[in-house]
Each structure stands twice: as C-alpha cells, then as structure tokens.
Amino acid sequence: MEKVQFSVQINAPVHLVWTTMLEDASYREWTSAFQEGSYFDGSWTMHGVLRFLAPDATGAPSGLIGRVVEKRTDEFVSVEYIGQVVDGVDDTESERARSLIGMRENYSFSEENGVTTVTVDQDTSGEMAAMLEDAWPKSLAALKELAED
C-alpha cells in the first residue's frame, strides 16, 4: 500500500470550506476531475456509510464504499474503505474489493488568518496512484474556486 498527500490553501473560513467539500451539490462539482458525474450516496456522520459513485461505461453506478471512522467538524474526517460498487451492486468479497478494505482517505482542515489549508492523505495501490496524482490537484483547485467564489 502506498500513501499520497495533497493540499491546498483556500482564502475562506474553515467552516465554509468544510461545507463546500462535503455537501452534495458542491461535492459533485469539485469531484468531477475524478470522473464526470461523480457523487456520493450516504452520510458523513460518524460511522455513516458512503458510496462514492459515478456512472460507468454502461451508465450503471460504480465506485467505492467507505465508512466514516473519525470525524471532528471543521477539523478532520477519515473514511475507511469497506468495498466497491460494480454495476450498481455492492461488492465486498471479490479480490479487488478485498484489496480496498482498510484503505483510508483523510481530510484535514486548519485555518489561520482567514486562510484554510485542506490536506488530503490517502492510501492507494499502484494502479490508482497515477489517477490520484492527476485528479486530486485538479479537484482541490476546483474546491478552492468554489469556496472562494
């Protein structure tokens, strides 16, 4: 397992950045760099299950399943992956799904003098690392634009 880290400084209060990152409508906008049509289904509450989805080539929802394992509003949220969604069906048993179990995606937020720093720390495997290296900087730039607008 590899770890990747990305960060951005945003000229906006931390609560605004937190809300922009995690609310449904704005989430759909800033995550489009990962895949057009990206969205989540579920809840960012402690122990909430989230499905991070986008339409696959046939239009069926596909993506990752995670559980919120730590949350401090306006400071930190950690999602641990527990499987994947393939063709609209939850999969926690295939080899690919099992390889995801236990990987984490963490968002840290800190504010100083009206500038919020968002840091993303994510576990990954070799096959996903290149995609993350490409998509996260674009997504964080979109988040910055949304929060500063």
Predicted regions and their residues:
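Hydrophobic ligand-binding cavity/cleft-lining segments
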Residues: M1-S38
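Intrinsic-disorder/low-complexity, polar/charged segments enriched in Ser/Thr/Lys/Arg/Asp/Glu/Gln
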Residues: K3-Q9, V14, V49, G63, ...
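Generic detector of contiguous secondary-structure segments
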Residues: F6-P13, E29-T31, A54-E75, A130-L132
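Hydrophobic pocket/interface hotspot
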Residues: V17-M21, Y27, L50, V68, ...
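Hydrophobic-ligand binding "helix-grip"
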Residues: D41-S43, T58-N113
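Short coil-to-beta transition motif at edge beta-strands of beta-rich domains
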Residues: W44-F52
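Short, solvent-exposed aromatic-acidic interface loops
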Residues: I82-D87, D121-E127
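A conserved amphipathic terminal alpha-helix motif
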Residues: R98-I101, T117, D123-D149
